[in-house]
């Protein structure tokens, strides 16, 4: 076993803080409407230019093992905020850095780290409840466009596009982002259906750059059974190979020799196949297979109605213009099913919604209607160069996540104002002892950090602006884009409540653990061993 390097107490914490600061300082230059870009070197191709906090955080690896541990823990904050709400990664990093810096000062001054952490946790729980009371529902198109605009770094066209896409496919509809061909952004609404089942084997992937399987004009085999014996499949595979089209298999499961044979056929290029599990379970799976059959003009091969897989023909297959499968979703675009049949099916499900007794059933039925009737909206991002395209696409993705979060949990005043209002409302909060009170103060002081950083990135004086905003009340704040004070909601500067909440919770979670660190252990770097003298042969 390799020798270990161990650091204790202040030595460990100083190193850890240095790593935290390197990562956070790189990320926080991107915050706010006047945040700057960061250029990331790539081992191949052009460098990537980004203003997305999590993309910057993911690039950072430090040479010093102890500093790197600090950086990696804060990277986790950005990643978690990104997974939960899809945005707010820079805010989360700024909050984490502020809590860690203030917290470690308190530890150095002799406070008990565990009580500090309890105080921080108490403040965050109270702050989350307070955020919920400040939250305003986000339902109209104008508010959705404003949230999208702020999240796309004040790009109004992106905000409007997302609001338009949500109008067309509904708030439950599926919206995807693709590379455009021109200079302008476009919005395409494609009839389609998406369900959460990915490919059964990564060997089906034919677009390695996106990690997806794309099938053009495939046949779609729908089977309400497990397929493990390849002999059942042979007639279908031969017919599809003759037709020269790809095949998508949607079945209860495809396993064993059947899956292995499909993979081998695909890799050898004999027939292009992909297999996914059918969505849902039990009766809901049968119903969803029937939905897909209606959409694609196919028939579900089910032994319950006396159909056997060996006897299936191309007439029983569904068809679609295009199918995209990634590791956890499958999207069927432009199924060839008849409009009348689709509308009939939608009517049938709506009737079931009226008769449904439980909220859960009603919700699942509404999801099915959205998938059958809503379609898929595709935002095509236009740009002059590939570098700009990548940067813009990342921003549109962020904005899309933010608007979904806003529709889900509502919005609060943006520009760091909501956290300042929460902190002032919690100024009377107390813990069980003095050290916990210091922990509460650390968390409340850290809640000013996002506003201060936004102002700093504008080249203004953070303390002056922070004090002016604190002196106001309600949604009164500082518009960093125009450098004016006013009502943030009226000025259209909104943050999704979910994004602000997630940023605060994840920042406090990781920062609290780092404050309570007393010892760090890592491998001793392997030095070059001493050169062995060459053994002479004598004489």
From Swiss-Prot:
It holds the Pfam family Cpn60_TCP1. It is found in: Cytoplasm. It comes from the Bacteria. It catalyses: ATP + H2O + a folded polypeptide = ADP + phosphate + an unfolded polypeptide. Its EC number is 5.6.1.7. One of its GO terms (cellular component) is cytoplasm. Keywords: ATP-binding, Chaperone, Cytoplasm, Isomerase, Nucleotide-binding. ATP binds at residues 30-33, 51, 87-91, 415, 479-481, 495. InterPro entries: Chaperonin_Cpn60_CS, Cpn60/GroEL, Cpn60/GroEL/TCP-1, GroEL-like_apical_dom_sf, GROEL-like_equatorial_sf, TCP-1-like_intermed_sf. GO terms for biological process: protein refolding. GO terms for molecular function: ATP binding; ATP-dependent protein folding chaperone; isomerase activity. Belongs to the chaperonin (HSP60) family. HAMAP family: CH60. Forms a cylinder of 14 subunits composed of two heptameric rings stacked back-to-back. Interacts with the co-chaperonin GroES. Together with its co-chaperonin GroES, plays an essential role in assisting protein folding. The GroEL-GroES system forms a nano-cage that allows encapsulation of the non-native substrate proteins and provides a physical environment optimized to promote and accelerate protein folding. This is Chaperonin GroEL.
